[in-house]
Every structure is written in C-alpha cells, then in structure tokens.
Design a protein with these regions (language model features):
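Fe(II)/2-oxoglutarate oxygenase catalytic core
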Residues: 1-143, 147-182, 188-212
C-alpha cells in the first residue's frame, strides 16, 4: 500500500500544511481545495433544498438561547447530518475528518467533532459582525468554510470580512466567496461578518469543537 495515499483527493501533505499555517497565523486560505465538479454538485444540492423548502432561517445562540434574528443574520441553512448526507457531502465530511486529525497532530487542540451547515444567502442577505463562539462557551475552536460560488466578482458583494485585531475595527481583510475556496481560522481569534450579497451565495460552514 502506498504511504500517504490521499483518501479523499487532497494529499495528506496539504492537510498537514493547512494545520501548520493555522498554528502559525490562525488563518488559512486555500483556493481550489476541491475539484470544480464536486463544488458544483454541492451547490446544486443546496439550490434543490432551497426549491424544496429544505432550508430554514438561521439563528443565533444555542439551545434555550436560540433565536432567529434577522437583524443579525438573514441566511438560510440546513445542518449537515452524517446519517443522511449525500455522497458529495460525505466526501467533504471525510476530508474534514482527515483535516481534524491533522490539526490535532499539530495544534493539540483536542478537537473532538465537526458540526456544520449548508448556508444560502439570498440576494441582500448578510451576517453582522460576530465571533463563532457563543457567549460563555468556547466549544467551537476552529471555523472551516467552503465556498460554492463559481465566478464570484467584487461587484457581487458577500465578502467575508475578517478582523485580525478585535480591538481595531479599521483593520480588516475581505475575502470573496469564490467556489472551491476554503477558509479556516481559530474561532475565538477572528471577529468577522458577511457583507450583503447581491447574488445568491452558497457555502458550507462548520466548526471543529471540543467536548461539551
Ligand atoms: C458563520 C459565518 C461566514 C461566511 O456562518 O458563522 O460567519 O463567509 N459565515 O459564510
Ligand atoms: Mn461566523
């Protein structure tokens, strides 16, 4: 058997690189992380869910604290469930499992599981500035976002705006949600927001968590 054989199409070395970069800078961006056909498949499944009423208004907070609050975010989501995942979703989940192990080997974060959702931002939708850790809990340690939008341009809006210094609102980095782009960052270190999208915007967003 070949050592280091890629199980899911992304060489183990690339995953180790992502983990290293995450350890060094807290933020990693990888374009063309997955082949265009797989991205298109994931996107078309998202559009089918939209058409069949399979998406719900996203909320903020957990459990009792959950609120659908469209002043803060106006995207629509479906949580991923490994039991009912499509083959394309399962492929991506498999890759994330390898990434989780690679990050644990490098950062010793004790990442335990992944939770994530497909997200669709209709034209005009946004997500105001926030941290991916709910008040009083730090279970989400690493955020991983995969964008599903081919040919996204500046004029389409919908940028992910990251603030590397929580105390300095004037310093930020904008990223377009280009299909195949993977963005991975330490959840507690980067406040961020999604600027209003002028086109429908699709992504799979998730978090590696530690045990409750
Ligand atoms: C989120 C989020 C960013 C994006 O869902 O928590 O911040 O670019 N998403 O989709
Ligand atoms: Mn977020």
């Amino acid at each position: 058997m070949m050592l280091n054989a890629p199980l899911t199409g992304v060489p183990a070395n690339d995953l180790a690189d992502i983990a290293l970069k995450l350890a060094e800078t807290g933020l990693v961006i990888r374009d063309d992380f997955l082949p265009a056909e797989l991205i298109e498949q994931l996107a078309s499944e998202g559009r089918a869910l939209r058409d069949n009423g399979g998406l719900r208004a996203a909320g903020i907070g957990r459990g009792q604290q959950f609120q659908a609050n469209s002043a803060i975010r106006s995207d629509h989501i479906q949580w991923l469930d490994p039991e009912t995942a499509t083959p394309a979703q399962r492929h991506y989940l498999g890759l994330l499992e390898e990434l989780r192990l690679a990050i644990n080997r490098t950062l010793f974060l004790g990442l335990f599981e992944f939770e994530g959702h497909l997200a669709l931002y209709p034209p005009g939708a946004y997500y105001r500035r926030h941290l991916d850790q709910f008040q009083g809990t730090q279970h989400r340690l690493v955020t991983v976002i995969l964008y599903l939008n081919p040919e996204w341009r500046e004029a389409d809006g919908g940028q992910l705006r990251l603030y590397p210094d929580p105390a300095d609102d004037g310093r930020f980095q904008d990223l377009l949600p280009i299909g195949g782009r993977l963005v991975c960052f330490l959840s507690g270190d980067f406040p961020h927001e999604v600027l209003p999208a002028r086109r429908e915007r699709l992504s799979i967003t998730g978090w590696f968590r530690k045990r409750d």
